[in-house]
């Protein structure tokens, strides 16, 4: 197992301890000081995130496994977002499957029942056979675990870009439901509690936290990938929820394994653990391997002595291993024993106080152009629409209706929608925009929060909270670090503006190949929202009016049009007040039952939003002169991706205008019965070929 600590960090350890640590202690420090566990290159900036709010029950707190939001009537939702990027690049099936399993265990560690999953996947171009292999196995792994354990995958994203050729991104978000007075902490508050482990410890996942904290080397790193067992995971899920009121704290044994789980759960107290008592899957494991193994389907409990027997009996009923391996103590030292000898004895504050780094920052030099590409209307439409594809091939492999709480199916709307036990509806949406982030990560950070807010509004929901995942290359590279810091600034600003506090998140650095080529900056957020009144299930009605809410701007840089034909102009600025006002208007129109279709304008611009109507078997006709804009140029009118805009379908546009209160509103066209025909300024274009491609592309290329 490799030690990833720098020479500076190793010397710092020696100075603080006034001695040379042994091998087991070096592995312990390496795991807890890894970027994956310590956030040593990011924590300084993450403190700018808003984490408090009216509905926040558990926010960004050290060592809590998930955030919690109040959804009324004594109920809370628990939110978590994680990735398994590095493991999925090596073993995509198990990497993705264990990513789902880890999220499930993070949710149940709060005493919550998992009710929904979202997956956000990014791989390279599918013309590359390896990328097809990655995608096929990533989807299979997610489906295998989610379907087997009985938690629906209700939505997500699927995106392709060459920057992910060697580094796929596999993000999974989970939501659970729990009575808010039954939320279980992940840390202990008093000594004397017994440390109980459930599950068998094996050789898989050795050094996984350190593996996730460096770039892929091209060497055989399969041993750092954990093996998924959803059937064991189902036992862990059910029994953990059964005994949740009998324990004082719960923690998933995830990144860094037992040594990280015990240290974080101790939360500054001490712990004494006997490794001889840890149930093993493989005989003769070395103590160092027991310490940092990341074998899946294991949990750690802090239990009062009088409840230990009841907790273990519940697991042993299913022949699932359960053992008392130690105790939390007042003395702030983490100690591990093996064979009657003390092999680790380290101060808690040393382990939980890694050095913090602020690396050099340098603004990337981007090649800018003001030269507009020369392209015709029909050529541009066909090029854009050919990039927009149905994700049905992926989500058809998931059981998205298990549990009977799914209200809107994947692909049916811009947001997932699930029912809660109190009768309310919860909306969920994940958003990222790597193309924009590659141009301006500050505006990108703001825009992904704003887009998620609009996505929720399009089904009738108002955002209440956010979890984030920040995925970048090597933080020691000044241009990468600049993008990272600026993305945080944008996300923080927008989250404060929309009153959607960030209740949890993750940072993933070193997403680059062995040549040092990094992915595009990919900050991702998942926003949760509540329906206060009515929700919208989109339908397209012939002769209804296509009404544009919002103002279109000549801001083309970072757009899908720019990606295809060449970037030019300025990046779209996130004007958060416009997003807020437009979103509130759409929610009000849904509640007033004055619209029957709503779609925010984002990737691909207005044309892409109109395409979501065309694929439903109708036609559209619009006049570009009716589009409120700062330009007469048809290209930005059709393809700009600036925010604050929706298209809605209505039979009463005058009502919308009366309710708009200063927001730009314009009837730009009508729905026709001419299937697959888009008519723009009296020019008809048949896009039935692109509609066929939309439905069939993934099925054909992945066959």
From Swiss-Prot:
Its EC number is 6.3.5.3. Keywords: ATP-binding, Cytoplasm, Ligase, Magnesium, Metal-binding, Nucleotide-binding, Purine biosynthesis. It comes from Sulfurisphaera tokodaii (strain DSM 16993 / JCM 10545 / NBRC 100140 / 7) (Sulfolobus tokodaii). ATP binds at residues 39, 80, 468, 505. GO terms for cellular component: cytoplasm. Belongs to the FGAMS family. Mg(2+) 1 binds at residue 82. NCBIfam families: FGAM_synth_II, PRK01213.1. Pathway: Purine metabolism; IMP biosynthesis via de novo pathway; 5-amino-1-(5-phospho-D-ribosyl)imidazole from N(2)-formyl-N(1)-(5-phospho-D-ribosyl)glycinamide: step 1/2. It is an enzyme of class 6 (ligase). GO terms for biological process: 'de novo' IMP biosynthetic process. InterPro entries: PRibForGlyAmidine_synth_PurL, PurL_linker, PurM-like_C_dom, PurM-like_C_sf, PurM-like_N, PurM-like_N_sf. Pfam families: AIRS (PF00586), AIRS_C (PF02769), FGAR-AT_linker (PF18072). Mg(2+) 2 binds at residues 106, 252. The keyword Disulfide bond does not apply. Substrate binds at residues 83-86, 105, 226, 294-296, 508. The active site is at 36, 84 (proton acceptor). Part of the phosphoribosylformylglycinamidine synthase complex involved in the purines biosynthetic pathway. Catalyzes the ATP-dependent conversion of formylglycinamide ribonucleotide (FGAR) and glutamine to yield formylglycinamidine ribonucleotide (FGAM) and glutamate. The FGAM synthase complex is composed of three subunits. PurQ produces an ammonia molecule by converting glutamine to glutamate. PurL transfers the ammonia molecule to FGAR to form FGAM in an ATP-dependent manner. It catalyses: N(2)-formyl-N(1)-(5-phospho-beta-D-ribosyl)glycinamide + L-glutamine + ATP + H2O = 2-formamido-N(1)-(5-O-phospho-beta-D-ribosyl)acetamidine + L-glutamate + ADP + phosphate + H(+). One of its GO terms (molecular function) is magnesium ion binding. HAMAP family: PurL_2 (MF_00420). It is found in: Cytoplasm. Monomer. Part of the FGAM synthase complex composed of 1 PurL, 1 PurQ and 2 PurS subunits. This is Phosphoribosylformylglycinamidine synthase subunit PurL. The lineage of its organism: Archaea, Thermoproteota, Thermoprotei, Sulfolobales, Sulfolobaceae.
